[in-house]
């Protein structure tokens, strides 16, 4: 069994300029979210029972936070985003993660190149990581499969091969439909950009994003 915590990655402080990058989420996670979960739910404590994963911008947060706090996490899932410097820090750390999982869509060329670079570094260091590429772009077709493959690894022994991951049988979609549902509507995925959302804080300094057409 596991508890999945999906918190807001935007952690602006009172008086902080509300920009797109999500403030001090690391502090929010370590000093507020983790203690709250441990104090209010029946969970096992310690890094062996804690993992972190994220997609797109969330993958950057994951690699940054895990790299700085290797004693707090035993696994990292990086979906569609490779922060080279942070991944190198994870590889070079004296602490070793039980699971390092990277993934992206087959059309995300820049991310695929970064993943290959990190794979090679882990291999040269004698450390283990899993890298998966799925049909798709920077979108949910890829991230759903990434999560589906990542989660079982948290309950398996070290050294499991990527090909050993059981795959869910899904109907293969045509390339035309894939493009229609992803690339052609890519801008819709970035709803804040598409709708011109304004990232602001309320009087208490809490995130208060507003759409221009919503009072």
Task: For the regions a language model picked out, list residue spans one by one.
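Short, intrinsically disordered, charge-balanced linker/junction segments flanking boundaries
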Residues: 211-214
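Exposed regions on extracellular, virion, or secretory-pathway luminal proteins
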Residues: 207-209
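Non-catalytic cap/lid and distal C-terminal segments of serine-dependent acyl enzymes
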Residues: 1-199, 205
């Amino acid at each position: 069994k596991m508890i999945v915590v999906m918190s807001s990655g935007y952690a602006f402080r009172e008086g902080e300029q509300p920009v797109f990058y999500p403030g001090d989420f690391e502090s929010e996670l370590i000093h507020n979210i983790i203690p709250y979960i441990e104090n209010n739910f029946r969970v096992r404590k310690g890094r062996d029972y804690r993992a972190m994963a994220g997609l797109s911008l969330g993958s950057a947060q994951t690699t940054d936070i895990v790299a700085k706090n290797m004693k707090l996490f035993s696994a990292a899932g990086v979906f569609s985003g490779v922060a080279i410097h942070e991944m190198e820090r994870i590889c070079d750390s004296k602490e070793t993660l039980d699971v390092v999982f990277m993934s992206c869509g087959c059309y995300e060329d820049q991310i695929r190149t970064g993943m290959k670079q990190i794979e090679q570094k882990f291999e040269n260091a004698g450390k283990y990581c899993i890298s998966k590429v799925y049909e798709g772009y920077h979108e949910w077709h890829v991230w759903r499969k990434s999560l589906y493959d990542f989660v079982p690894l948290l309950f398996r022994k070290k050294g499991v091969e990527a090909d050993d991951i059981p795959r869910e049988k899904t109907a293969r979609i045509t390339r035309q439909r894939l493009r229609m549902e992803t690339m052609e509507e890519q801008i819709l995925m970035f709803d804040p950009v598409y709708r011109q959302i304004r990232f602001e804080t309320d009087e208490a300094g809490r995130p208060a994003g507003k759409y221009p057409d919503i009072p």
